[in-house]
A protein has these predicted regions:
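Short, charged, surface-exposed secondary-structure boundary motifs
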Residues: 3-7, 53-58, 125-128
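Conserved nucleotide-sensing/catalytic segment adjacent to the nucleotide-binding pocket
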Residues: 38-109
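Extreme N-terminal, non-catalytic leader segments
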Residues: 1-17
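Short, acidic/turn-prone active-site loops that include or flank metal/cofactor-
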Residues: 1, 48-51, 121-122
Length: 178
């Protein structure tokens, strides 16, 4: 079975016509992908398969990530369900979604695919993220340990500012700053 999954992940991605939804965080790409699916479009939802939203704060509450092998089995099934004569929409991701690695053939196909860029004004993105990540804003203690992972990329002053915004639950400037 494992050999079948690995073959599937090598053979199918180059054979399908991927269209990438790209854009900044908070432009509702996943929601657009899901709406496209409801309207008959073929999609591969990597974030759903990986149980992770792809960002530092992307872990799903009460939903651990699957093993790499289980992710790959689910991905293989999702790819096998695609008609190669039709476009397949997929959200732009890095080659790692949380602890899950996107298989090399799919990653290469994604990098070569045509792309649709989704844009939204900053205020709309902030409002969307505040709603979509309500599980974090309702439990701020979850956020700081995650932000500490950014200490090598941001100054102590920036981390202190984020800490103050979190403590005041002043979400719009915190979200915009991230």
């Amino acid at each position: 079975y494992r050999r079948h999954v690995l073959d599937c992940l090598d053979v199918i991605p180059p054979a399908i016509s991927l269209v990438i939804l790209s854009g900044q965080t908070g432009t509702a790409k996943t929601h657009i992908l899901q709406a496209a699916s409801k309207n008959g479009a073929q999609i591969v939802d990597l974030e759903s398969l990986a149980c992770h939203r792809g960002s530092l704060l992307g872990s799903e509450p009460d939903k651990p990530q699957p093993s790499q092998r289980l992710f790959e089995s689910r991905l293989c099934q999702s790819l096998k369900n695609c008609d190669p004569q039709q476009h397949v929409f997929i959200e732009a991701e890095s080659n790692k979604i949380g602890n899950i690695h996107v298989p090399p053939a799919l990653w290469a196909a994604m990098r070569a695919a045509q792309s649709i860029r989704v844009t939204a004004p900053m205020t709309a993105r902030v409002n969307f993220l505040q709603r979509d990540y309500a599980h974090m804003t309702q439990n701020p203690a979850v956020i700081m340990p995650l932000l500490s992972k950014l200490k090598h990329r941001h100054s102590a002053a920036q981390l202190a500012e984020w800490d103050a915004l979190i403590n005041r639950q002043d979400w719009p400037p915190f979200i915009e700053s991230l």
